[in-house]
Design a protein with these regions (language model features):
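Acidic-enriched and Gly/Ser
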Residues: 1-178
Length: 178
């Protein structure tokens, strides 16, 4: 859900309705600006009116990036758009050809944000060999993925393995079984 607040468009990332024992109810929110990517915490009173913003979602395919800008192609009409890196969550996990959802403002038709799938499958290109030692807990080691991202993986993961990575948190989920 996107809202207009303080002359900016925000995406509601988190919200919590609070009804204290004393006093009126309120809603705590975490809002992400769609223009500059900053996340703010805000509290709305129960009677506060909010203007929602109409948005459209379309599927786009990632083509390439040239530093700070990522280029995408609409999978329906093949139109291409360019989006700055600050509008992407975990862009280091996106590989060329990845299909993503681009959210655009219905009124201005400008892109607001890019949503990746919940998880992606990437190949480990370099990691140290795992040595079983005196580990009482789940030991991890850093691994560099095909996109250049570095994530911590369990000791049993080796170079060449494909792993599933959570795109929201940017961490290892499981080994991919082909």
């Amino acid at each position: 859900l996107c809202i207009r607040y303080n002359n900016d468009i925000y995406k509601i990332v988190e919200f919590l309705h609070v009804k204290p024992g004393k006093g009126p109810a309120f809603v705590r929110t975490k809002l992400k600006s769609m223009t500059n990517g900053k996340v703010i915490d805000n509290t709305f009173s129960a009677g506060h009116k909010i203007e929602d913003v109409r948005v459209e979602t379309r599927k786009y395919q990632s083509l390439y990036n040239d530093g700070e800008t990522y280029h995408f192609m609409n999978t329906d009409d093949y139109n291409q758009i360019s989006i700055e890196e600050k509008f992407l969550d975990n862009p280091q996990l996106m590989k060329e050809g990845e299909v993503v959802t681009v959210i655009t403002n219905s009124e201005t038709n400008l892109p607001l944000s890019v949503e990746m799938p919940p998880s992606v499958i990437l190949e480990v290109v370099s990691t140290e060999p795992g040595v079983k030692g005196n580990t009482a807990t789940n030991a991890t080691k850093p691994a560099t993925l095909e996109t250049g991202a570095v994530v911590n993986v369990p000791l049993f993961i080796n170079e060449g393995d494909k792993i599933k990575v959570d795109t929201v948190k940017g961490n290892y989920k499981e080994r991919h079984k082909e």
